[in-house]
């Protein structure tokens, strides 16, 4: 690597800092960076926080003052980009230590920000160490958990969905009075609810070991869990990160401790619950898809994730997004809203897989139909997944081409590399055939022309045309003699049925005359 700090536009000053957070605040496809400084105005050469806009050419521009996010000279431990009001623009939360309140900068969408901490209800003053963002109640609005020192305890902020937050630390049972540092959201048991892990250590000069905390989300509240292994050992924990070291779909935890306790990797023993792992790859948006909103729907349940970079205290989570699915066996839909404004939607996904979703994949990798798209019951249709290395259709077929004989939704995973890519599912509908009821009146006499035929289509689609083999057209015929009449009935969906109608007639009447001679 070559150090390009001085030439790429990043300001070269002496400062103290504990975090950088990355986000595309102007949604131009290039990640910008916010540098947090832990300096107050009483320190020599005190610096504010810095926002550097990525110019897309390998250089950055200092837009701190233009954007209005300097935060003054305050003791900032951490900052995080996330969209708290669901307007698609990444906002900025700044967690400040000691006597400095926390700040929430609302993204105005024009390169500037408005500070709304007081109005949003998050401008409290306490020893904010770190902030982690997640949607713990699956309502589609992202909440915050901020760690603190023992005096006031940690803060859980519930997003009310109207631009404000409510402190629910006590009511959610996540309030704890220890020296807390890093915290992460993770669905440790894959039950569809995100749990909470908090790293703890006593503060200098004591540096007493603390017991890390794990709060299991029950769906209605949180309960401290003491049987996970994580919470049975005294640690000197500062930071934690989430990942999946053995790719089993259960999130593992890496904990960074102060010496003499070393770094610890805690492997999740897992279970039988199902899961989905998703990683994003931007094409128009930034490569990692940072700033994307993902919504998973299954059996009427919804889960939401927001992709971030640098949201943890002295750590970074894996870019894999985890969705626990308990005993559900199919995902109804997965929606990715990218920073570019593009939306990918995938339907009817199987569970227990790791997917790399490429921006635009749901429309680029279309399933092609071979032959006519006007299909009726009794016909067949061939679907083409395109040229890839491997295939897995929703039917279980592993061939490129799939022949279908009945209505349904068909999707396929295709792979041209390490991970599978999903195609847009296709709905196939076989139109029902016409159902013809035949009403007849047979000729009343031999060789008479008073026969009658009426065809009544009681099928789903109306009749468009009836053609008889003798050239007549229409559903009603009269003035018919006995015989066999063949027709083709076609409905408005293009489906047809061909049958024949037989009209019988009475036998001819024969008369015989007998003469008897009369003898006189």
Indicate residue ranges for each PLM-predicted region:
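Acidic carboxylate motifs that coordinate Ca2+ or other divalent cations, activating on Asp/Glu
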Residues: 28, 32, 87, 91, ...
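Proline- and Ser/Thr-rich low-complexity, intrinsically disordered segments
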Residues: 361-520
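Blade-edge motifs of beta-propeller repeat domains
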Residues: 1-15, 52-74, 105-126, 157-178, ...
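Short, solvent-exposed loop/turn segments at conserved positions within beta-propeller repeat blades
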Residues: 42-47, 96-100, 149-152, 205-210, ...
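Hydrophobic beta-strand segments that make up the repeating blades of beta-propeller
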Residues: 33-37, 92-96, 144-148, 196-200, ...
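Beta-propeller blade termini
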Residues: 17-27, 77-86, 119-120, 128-138, ...
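Short proline/glycine-enriched turn/loop motifs at strand-loop junctions of beta-rich domains
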Residues: 98, 150-151, 289, 328-329, ...
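Gly/Ser/Thr/Pro-enriched helix-cap/hinge segments flanking short amphipathic alpha-helices
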Residues: 207, 221-365
């Amino acid at each position: 690597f070559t150090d390009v700090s001085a030439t790429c536009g990043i300001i070269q000053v002496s400062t103290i800092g504990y975090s950088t957070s990355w986000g595309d605040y102007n949604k131009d496809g290039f990640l910008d960076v916010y540098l947090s400084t832990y300096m107050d105005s009483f320190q020599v050469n005190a610096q504010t926080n810095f926002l550097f806009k990525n110019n897309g050419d390998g250089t950055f521009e200092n837009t701190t003052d233009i954007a209005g996010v300097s935060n003054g000279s305050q003791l900032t431990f951490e900052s995080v980009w996330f969209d708290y009001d669901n307007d698609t623009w990444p906002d900025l939360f700044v967690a400040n230590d000691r006597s400095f309140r926390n700040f929430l900068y609302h993204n105005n969408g024009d390169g500037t920000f408005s500070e709304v901490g007081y109005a949003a209800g998050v401008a409290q003053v306490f020893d904010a160490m770190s902030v982690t963002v997640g949607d713990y109640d699956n309502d589609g609005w992202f909440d915050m958990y901020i760690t603190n020192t023992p005096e006031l305890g940690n803060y859980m902020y519930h997003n009310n969905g109207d631009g404000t937050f409510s402190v629910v630390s006590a009511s959610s049972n996540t309030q704890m009075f220890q020296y807390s540092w890093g915290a992460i959201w993770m669905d440790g048991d894959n039950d569809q609810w995100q749990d909470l892990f908090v790293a703890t250590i006593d503060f200098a000069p004591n540096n007493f070991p603390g017991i890390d905390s794990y709060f299991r989300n029950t769906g209605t509240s949180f309960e401290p869990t003491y049987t996970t292994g994580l919470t049975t050992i005294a640690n000197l924990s500062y930071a934690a990160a989430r990942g999946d070291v053995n790719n089993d779909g259960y999130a593992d935890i890496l904990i960074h401790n102060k010496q003499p306790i070393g770094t610890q990797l805690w492997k999740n023993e897992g279970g039988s619950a199902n899961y989905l792992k998703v990683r994003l790859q931007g094409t128009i948006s930034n490569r990692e898809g940072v700033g994307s909103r993902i919504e998973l729907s299954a059996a009427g349940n919804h889960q939401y994730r927001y992709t971030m970079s640098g949201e943890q205290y002295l750590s970074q989570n894996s870019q894999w997004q985890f969705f626990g699915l308990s005993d559900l066996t199919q995902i109804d839909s997965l929606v990715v809203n990218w920073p570019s404004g593009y939306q990918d939607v995938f339907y009817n996904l199987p569970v227990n897989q790791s997917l790399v979703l490429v921006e635009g994949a749901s429309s680029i990798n279309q399933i092609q139909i071979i032959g006519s798209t006007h299909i009726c019951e009794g016909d067949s249709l061939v679907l083409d997944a395109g040229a890839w290395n491997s295939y897995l259709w929703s039917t279980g077929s592993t061939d490129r081409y799939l022949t279908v004989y009945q209505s349904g939704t068909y999707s396929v995973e295709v792979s041209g590399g390490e991970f599978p890519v999903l195609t847009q599912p296709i709905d196939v509908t076989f139109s029902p055939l016409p159902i013809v009821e035949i009403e007849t009146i047979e000729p009343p006499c031999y060789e008479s022309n008073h026969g009658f035929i009426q065809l009544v289509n009681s099928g789903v689609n109306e009749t468009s045309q009836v053609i008889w083999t003798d050239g007549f057209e229409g559903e009603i015929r009269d003035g018919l003699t006995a015989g066999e009449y063949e027709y083709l009935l076609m409905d408005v969906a293009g489906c047809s049925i061909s049958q024949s109608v037989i009209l019988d007639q009475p036998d001819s009447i024969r008369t015989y005359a007998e003469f008897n001679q009369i003898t006189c």
